[in-house]
Amino acid sequence: MDHLPMPKFGPLAGLRVVFSGIEIAGPFAGQMFAEWGAEVIWIENVAWADTIRVQPNYPQLSRRNLHALSLNIFKDEGREAFLKLMETTDIFIEASKGPAFARRGITDEVLWQHNPKLVIAHLSGFGQYGTEEYTNLPAYNTIAQAFSGYLIQNGDVDQPMPAFPYTADYFSGLTATTAALAALHKVRETGKGESIDIAMYEVMLRMGQYFMMDYFNGGEMCPRMTKGKDPYYAGCGLYKCADGYIVMELVGITQIAECFKDIGLAHLLGTPEIPEGTQLIHRIECPYGPLVEEKLDAWLAAHTIAEVKERFAELNIACAKVLTVPELESNPQYVARESITQWQTMDGRTCKGPNIMPKFKNNPGQIWRGMPSHGMDTAAILKNIGYSENDIQELVSKGLAKVED
């Protein structure tokens, strides 16, 4: 198979990935593959472009390194072209409502007839099967969080709150990436394709288990946090200093002992409630939990962030300033690692945003292209799989494909 024109780089060079999906979850999986060197083809509707394009800046990040194919994959010759593309594809990712592809005649079995080794990742809110009440429902970030038990754990004591920005979308997209790579590893051993059913709510159910396991195995449900503080442990979470906010984790025998001396609670060490060797202070079970919070709040409020960071470094207490977005660019760690970078958009503008992550030492990722326009690579992709100029024009004339104007 000849690949589309692009530089060769990263650990996934030579891999062909195709995805069909809008907004964030499914495309995020595709983006990860593209930044790690895979050739990634982004399928868009012919009549309506991906709704993410209405955003002014985010798409330049989320759709960089992609090849844009505008094709009606469910109808007539458009469907034929899609299935021909699948013959040269390693991984196909689709994000839709339940078994939408199967309902429209593109089942796993149809895809495997064209490519027995194909890895297929289905990403939806509620999965490919289950009850009709849920399976075919649309789902976004907040829906998946609400249905999974994740949302109810977040927020404040007075009201639950979803985690933003769009946590369920990113977790689900990354799950699709890792699951597809796991499946591909097995396919290369067996020669038999795989189909993966990724339900966004199940992803969030798995991510939200730290506290829920206590309910499933004893009936105890953890309360929500208070003003950003850990719901279980004193000295953990968000705190206010004289000039801003920090997060800290008061964990460890010596850390607690030394911190208690600073905040005036050394006399509690070695008591039945806080015996020698205590590594965590339970804010509910320990009767002194509220007092620890009161004293710690007062001490932190009387010191600047710089003073707190210096003292906590001496005590080996983990803490960090809550950075504002403008502070990111000038932070020395960001600068040293080039965590924020710049690249050129297709129309020649400079775009700034997050760099490739993670950092591969021997086969690093690369930003080689900005977001392509709607249908920009349709002709090149169709030619790559054997279509002539006349074939492509016929698809366009029938409204089954769109090429760049």
UniProtKB/Swiss-Prot annotation:
Pathway: Amine and polyamine metabolism; carnitine metabolism
Source organism superkingdom: Bacteria
Entry's Gene Ontology molecular function annotations: L-carnitine CoA-transferase activity
Keyword check for Transferase: yes
Compartments in which it is found: Cytoplasm
Main location: cytoplasm
Top-rank EC class of the record's enzyme: transferase
Single GO biological process annotation from the record: carnitine metabolic process
Active site: D169 (nucleophile)
Pfam families per record: CoA_transf_3 (PF02515)
GO cellular component: cytoplasm
Reactions catalysed according to its record: crotonobetainyl-CoA + (R)-carnitine = crotonobetaine + (R)-carnitinyl-CoA; 4-(trimethylamino)butanoyl-CoA + (R)-carnitine = (R)-carnitinyl-CoA + 4-(trimethylamino)butanoate
SUPFAM superfamilies, alphabetized: CoA-transferase family III (CaiB/BaiF) (SSF89796)
EC number: 2.8.3.21
InterPro entries from the UniProt entry: CoA-transferase_III (IPR050509), CoA-Trfase_CaiB (IPR023452), CoA-Trfase_fam_III (IPR003673), CoA-Trfase_III_dom3_sf (IPR044855), CoA-Trfase_III_dom_1_sf (IPR023606)
Record keywords: Cytoplasm, Transferase
Entry binding sites for CoA: K97, R104
Keyword Phosphoprotein attached: no
Family to which the UniProt record says this protein belongs: Belongs to the CoA-transferase III family. CaiB subfamily.
NCBIfam families: PRK03525.1 (NF002914)
Subunit structure comment from the entry: Homodimer.
Function: Catalyzes the reversible transfer of the CoA moiety from gamma-butyrobetainyl-CoA to L-carnitine to generate L-carnitinyl-CoA and gamma-butyrobetaine. Is also able to catalyze the reversible transfer of the CoA moiety from gamma-butyrobetainyl-CoA or L-carnitinyl-CoA to crotonobetaine to generate crotonobetainyl-CoA.
Protein name stated in the entry: L-carnitine CoA-transferase
Species, as recorded: Escherichia coli O1:K1 / APEC
Gene: caiB
